[in-house]
């Protein structure tokens, strides 16, 4: 599913959080500072898009291309596409894994990485950050 891929890549990025804590989030995901700012500012709208279009549990391979794979931008099929950074599915997956880990500080890195996607998603109670 799209969600499984999001959390898979979210785990990789969370691992980077622990492995290279001195690096910025933008460096970890490969974004420019502007792309990182765009992702943070629009996190709530990105999440709303996934929910409203009911694509989290979809297995359509095209969703991987649109939201996970490297491309010049993420393909929402909206006017804002060309402004968006690539791989926003990975970015949202990262935020889900981070919220899960924050809610379970007793778990080791290995335990977090070994949790299945469904557990991480449900127990994260993911809520996108509000734009500042």
Each model region followed by its residue ranges:
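C-terminal soluble interaction/assembly domains
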Residues: 57-132
